[in-house]
C-alpha cells in the first residue's frame, strides 16, 4: 500500500535526522560518537543504539546509566521521536489491510488514555501481555478489550539490549 510505504519512508528520514540531532547534542556535551558506532546495519537507529555505543566507548557502565544521565525524556541529549497521530496510524493500517493494535498501553503516562484511544480511534486490538504490564494492568486491558469487543495481543518487546528485560528472546512468555 503506497501511502503507508510513503509515510514509513518519511518517518525513517525523520528518525535519521533525530539521530544526527542526538549525536550533535552529545558532541556538545563532550561525548564523541559517530553514526556508524550506533549500529551500521540498522536502518532504524534509536536511543538504545546510541546508549549501547556510549557504553562500548567506555563513557558509561550500562545502557540504563546512559538513559538516566542523558537520553531520558527531557534529558540533555534527548530529541523527541517523530510520531503519527493515532487516527492517521489506524487509518493507514486499515487501508493497507492490517489490524491496528494499541501497543504498550501500560507505558502511557495517563491511565485513562488507553480507553480514550480505543474508544475514539477504531483500534482492532490492545496489547494486554507485555513486560510493562503487571497483573493489575493485564486485568484492566482485558476488561477494556471485552468492553469494546477488540482483539487481545501480547509481545515480549525484545530488542536485544543488554541489561533491559527481557534480556533474551523467550524469557518473557505471552
Sequence positions of predicted segments:
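Extended substrate/RNA-proximal surfaces in nucleic-acid metabolism proteins
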Residues: 1-116
Amino acid at each position: 500500500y503506497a501511502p503507508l510505504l510513503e509515510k514509513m519512508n518519511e518517518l525513517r528520514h525523520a528518525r535519521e535526522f533525530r539521530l544526527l540531532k542526538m549525536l550533535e547534542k552529545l558532541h556538545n556535551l563532550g561525548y564523541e560518537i559517530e553514526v556508524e558506532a550506533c549500529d551500521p546495519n540498522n536502518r532504524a537507529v534509536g536511543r538504545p543504539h546510541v546508549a549501547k555505543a556510549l557504553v562500548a566507548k567506555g563513557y558509561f557502565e550500562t545502557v540504563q546509566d546512559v538513559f538516566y544521565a542523558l537520553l531520558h525524556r527531557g534529558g540533555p541529549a534527548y530529541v523527541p521521536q517523530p510520531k503519527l497521530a493515532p487516527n492517521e496510524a489506524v487509518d493507514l493500517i486499515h487501508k493497507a489491510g492490517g489490524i491496528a493494535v494499541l501497543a504498550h498501553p501500560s507505558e502511557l503516562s495517563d491511565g485513562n488514555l488507553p480507553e480514550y484511544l480505543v474508544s475514539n480511534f477504531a483500534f482492532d486490538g490492545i496489547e494486554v501481555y507485555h513486560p510493562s504490564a503487571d497483573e493489575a494492568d493485564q486485568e484492566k486491558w482485558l476488561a477494556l478489550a471485552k468492553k469494546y469487543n477488540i482483539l487481545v495481543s501480547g509481545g515480549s518487546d525484545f530488542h536485544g539490549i543488554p541489561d533491559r528485560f527481557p534480556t533474551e528472546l523467550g524469557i518473557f512468555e505471552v
